Amino acid sequence: MLFVTRAWWPRLTGVIAILASRALTAAAQPAPAVAPTDWAAYLNGAAHSSFNAADTAITPSTVPALVQAWHWKGDPATMTGQPGPALFSSPTVADGAVYIGANTGWFYKLDEATGAVLAKVFLGYQPKLTCAARGFISTATVAVDPSDGQDTVYVGAPDGYLYALRATDLSQKWRSAVDIPSQTVSDYFLWSSPTVANGKIYIGSASHCDKPLTRGDLVAYDQATGQELARFFTVPAGFLGGGIWSSAAVDGSGYVYASTGTQPAGTSQRFYSVSIVKLDPNTLQPLAWFTVPNSQLFGDGDFGASPVIFGPYVGACNKNGIFYALDQATMTVAWEKQIGAKSTAASPAQCSAAPIYDGTSLYMAGDPTTINGVAYRGSIQRLDPSTGATLWETGLPNSVIGSPTMNGGGVIAVGTYDFTSTPNAVYLIDASTGAILRTLTTGGYTFAQSVFADGMLFTANVYRGLTAWHV
């Protein structure tokens, strides 16, 4: 279902002209190329900056003029037992198209200018009813296939496979199993998004909400063929736990970093669970790692946040509410900071958002916190990346699960996800001051990261669909 607002039509012709020009330019080249203003991967690249420096159209001064360009909602369920068209994965924007998977198991290519469906493919859904999400959570990456020079969409699907799809029509180039063959597909779930770097693809697997636990792992594939190259297990054979439901980061030297989940049941040993692990990019052998100290552990205190590379550091927030900044070389703690409260039954995924890194500051979304004596259910703050010192902090009425995002115009978008009756929204914030510039009422939960691309803002609401905004 698609809605294009009348107010958008005067602007629409200009956007179509830009995208058409890009398409003609791409056609004249031997291979298409992702533009600097695109958002072609989860957290906008292997370093996970969540920052689009080249996209500058939306600024603090133009935010009041932001209007809805179009709104789209996926196809309803048509099969027995199929979940509805909720959106838990984030949009990927490349080459004039938006790619997104729905909870129904359908994966879509939409026209960036109008929201019209250009192609779709069904890739399955989980039969187990243990989580709200049973279809897509994994966010796609669009990258040039080294074997043919063509843009290709890589995505982890609900059926347990990593897919390579042609960006033109979503036809399949190859697929490779991520789940361990000795386990049924329904025991595993691909929360992780694929990270493409240096001719390889990295993706992790985890359980379906710990029911039951699975043996966590990270797998490396050849980008051109889908052949499995290496597999890192977080716990030894015979143990279950350490699921990787975050997405791997890659630094400028090619080293891979993975944050891991739940401690194995029935043992006091942690192995590589509840840790941030540095891995060899070719063999996935662990080179160094940080494990959350016993004094900071609690029941469900795993890492849901993906690691982010910033300067000489790598860091991620744990569900204990603490962000750990680690020296990349030694994986020792450079600094740590309590960002929000621990996870609870009512708010089970605290501090699961990755921060923004714009080259000078970190912007970290938190959960229940107190600012100047006032209690807030959520927050976002700007930090000095060298020390963790707070530069500004802004309270939000609800908690944050999806990572915040920022463009080169100095605007941050952060959505809230809360089970209370308090309305959720996407908040647009001035990156310089922390002032809330505008509240985009979404009418429901925002689990996915909003993204800035090609002068637009794309917000995916769990039950209300995908909305494109433009000034």
Annotate each language-model stretch with its function.
Residues 35, 56-85, 96-100, 105-136, ...:
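Extracytoplasmic/lumenal domain signature
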